[in-house]
Amino acid sequence: MDPSPRVLIVSPVKNEAAHLQAVIRAVAAQDFPPARWIVVDDGSSDGTPAIARRVAADIPFMDVLDEGVGRGGRDPLAEGAAPKAFNRGLALVDLGEFTHVMKLDGDVELPPDYLQRLMSEFANDSRLGIACGDLVEGPPESRARIPIPAHHVHGAIKCYTLECFRAIGGLQERLGWDTIDETYARMRGYKTRSFRDFPAVHHRRLGSASGTLRGRARHGECAYVAHFSPLWVSLRAVKVARARPWGLTGAAFLYGYVRAAIQRVDRVPDPDFRRFARWELRQRMLRSLHVSPRAHL
């Protein structure tokens, strides 16, 4: 691995007292530690900032930004609370001092070699712009991988090269930020990828903060915001409907998309983004059918 990477980690956290100590210990124990780590507390009510401040005193690269009162409304995820807190952490540093920028949630525990192996993947592919290891969840004796496509990168644990981060304009403070950033990255010629061979542990089950059906509806709204086509959304809803509670998950996904369309929720205003996003989805649908794209040109 190139010894020169300087990784900045920013962790937006809220009410993570149950997990934060394990998360902090894991970052402190990295074989290749970050150059700096900023934990941004977004109005926790469970003692999270006190835990972070107490432990930070013994970790030279760790700082805590305690905002006191959360800025999120009734639905912080839908209002982009996480990227907003992330960006407030970024404002404390000179990005030019770093080579990589990573978002790490307060409930994700890294294995000791995580950053070292991730930096090796970046070093091996100059076009890799956004990456992560897999996430697993559940009790230690039966942990299971959270399934995602290889081109998708978990929002809880994303790492960007500084070049890519600047090329995509940073993180948008809105619902769907973690789809928008990847689409822009591929649009700009970068690769996005998750790696299965160095997983991290996600302590709070995916979607548990908001509920399964509400989360599926939010995913449907994300699809609208990112200009995903009605055909793709319909096919996706059929696939999603196979997850528990059966049928209702697909209906919730469609509901989120249709509701966003009726309410005319603001979409990504870039026409080039819209064209690329729909082109990319068409290619994936054709590949899933084992049909050559040339046959449909």
Indicate residue ranges for each PLM-predicted region.
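Active-site-proximal specificity loops/subdomain of glycosyltransferases
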Residues: P60-F98
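Non-catalytic, C-terminal membrane-associated alpha-helical segments of glycosyltransferases
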Residues: R214-L297
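Short beta-strand-to-loop acidic/aromatic patch adjacent to the donor-nucleotide binding site
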Residues: E97-E109
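Conserved donor NDP-sugar-binding/catalytic core segment of glycosyltransferases
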Residues: G72, E109-A144
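A conserved acidic beta->alpha catalytic loop
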Residues: D41-A50, V69, V108
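Short beta-strand/loop segment that forms part of the nucleotide-sugar
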Residues: P34-G43, L65-E67
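Conserved nucleotide-sugar donor-binding
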Residues: H154-G169
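Short, acidic, metal-binding catalytic loop of nucleotide-sugar glycosyltransferases
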Residues: R25-P34
